[in-house]
C-alpha cells in the first residue's frame, strides 16, 4: 500500500531548500509532508523522526472524522504545526515505529491523533484527499475552487507538480480529459446558479465564459435546453410547489 503522507517530528533544527524555496525548521516543530515531496526531506533525515500514513489509514480517518472537504487553489505540499506536547509525540512515533506495535485499535487511534494535530491548518483536508483521490478527482477539486478562472492545462499541471504529457496520459487511463472535466464542472455550476441567478450574462461570467453566446451554446449542447428554458422550468416547479403547499394548508384549516 503506497504512502500518502508522513508526519515528521523535528528534534534538531535545520535549514532546507524545498521546492525551490528556503525554509528554517525549528526544534520541536511538527510537519505533515505530502509523499510527492517527501524525497526533498531525505537529506535531513538525521534531524527528525517520522511516521508514514498509507491510503487505508487516510480513508478511514476521513470517514471517522466526517470532516467536510475544503479545497485550496494550490494544494499545500507540507503543513507546519507547533506548540505540541513534544515529549508525548516523540513517544507516540517511537511506539508506532516499533515492533511492539501489536494492538491494532490502539495504534490506529495514535495514528489518528497524529493527523489531528494539523486539523486546523489550511489545506489539511486537501492534502489528505489529494493522496487518495483519482487524478481526475484532483483536477476536479482544483477547477471547482474557482470556476470563473480561465483554466489552462498548464495551470493544473503547476498545481499537481506534473508534466502536461503525463497528466494527459493519466486522465486518458481514467477515460476522461481535462476539457471534459472542466466542461462538466462548469455546466453543473451553471445549472446550480440558474436556480438563484436570473442573469445569463452573470452566470456565464461566473462559470468562466468570456462569451455569453458561447456559454448558451455549450449549455444547450450539454443539457439539451437553453439556460433560459431551464430557468423557466425551475420557476414553474417552485410555483407548483408553493401552490401545493398553499392547498395543503387550506385543507388543514
From Swiss-Prot:
Residue ranges: DNA binding: 154-175, 200-223
SMART domains with a match to the protein in the record: HTH_ARAC
Keyword Transcription: yes
Induction entry: Induced by EvgA.
Entry GO MF terms: DNA-binding transcription factor activity; sequence-specific DNA binding
Record-annotated membrane-spanning stretches: none
Family annotation (Gene3D superfamilies): Homeodomain-like
Protein's UniProt keywords contain Phosphoprotein: no
Domain called HTH araC/xylS-type: residue spans: 137-233
InterPro entries, per the entry: Homeodomain-like_sf, HTH_AraC, HTH_AraC-typ_CS, Tscrpt_reg_AraC-type_HTH
Protein purpose: Induces the expression of gadE and mdtEF. Could also regulate the expression of other genes involved in acid resistance.
Name recorded for this polypeptide: HTH-type transcriptional regulator YdeO
Amino acid at each position: 500500500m503506497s504512502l500518502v503522507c508522513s508526519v515528521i517530528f523535528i528534534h534538531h533544527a535545520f535549514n532546507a531548500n524545498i521546492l525551490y524555496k528556503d525554509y528554517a525548521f525549528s526544534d520541536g516543530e511538527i510537519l505533515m509532508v505530502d509523499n510527492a515531496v517527501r524525497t526533498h526531506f531525505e537529506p535531513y533525515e538525521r534531524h527528525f523522526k517520522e511516521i508514514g500514513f498509507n491510503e487505508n489509514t487516510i480513508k478511514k480517518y476521513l470517514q471517522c472524522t466526517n470532516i467536510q472537504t475544503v479545497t485550496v487553489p494550490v494544494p499545500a505540499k507540507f503543513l507546519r504545526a507547533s506548540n505540541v506536547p513534544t515529549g508525548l509525540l516523540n513517544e507516540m512515533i517511537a511506539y508506532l515505529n516499533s515492533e511492539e506495535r501489536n494492538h491494532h485499535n490502539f495504534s490506529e487511534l495514535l495514528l489518528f491523533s497524529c493527523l489531528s494535530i494539523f486539523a486546523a491548518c489550511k489545506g489539511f483536508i486537501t492534502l489528505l484527499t489529494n493522496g487518495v483521490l483519482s487524478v481526475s478527482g484532483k483536477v476536479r477539486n482544483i477547477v471547482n475552487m474557482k470556476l470563473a478562472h480561465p483554466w489552462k492545462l498548464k495551470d493544473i499541471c503547476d498545481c499537481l507538480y506534473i508534466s502536461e504529457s503525463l497528466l494527459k496520459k493519466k486522465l486518458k487511463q481514467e477515460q476522461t480529459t481535462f476539457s471534459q472535466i472542466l466542461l462538466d464542472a462548469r455546466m453543473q455550476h451553471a445549472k446550480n446558479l440558474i436556480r438563484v441567478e436570473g442573469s445569463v450574462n452573470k452566470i456565464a461570467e461566473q462559470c468562466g465564459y468570456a462569451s455569453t453566446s458561447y456559454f448558451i451554446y455549450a449549455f444547450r449542447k450539454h443539457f439539451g435546453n437553453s439556460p433560459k428554458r431551464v430557468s423557466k422550468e425551475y420557476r414553474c416547479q417552485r410555483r407548483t410547489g408553493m401552490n401545493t403547499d398553499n392547498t395543503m394548508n387550506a385543507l388543514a384549516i
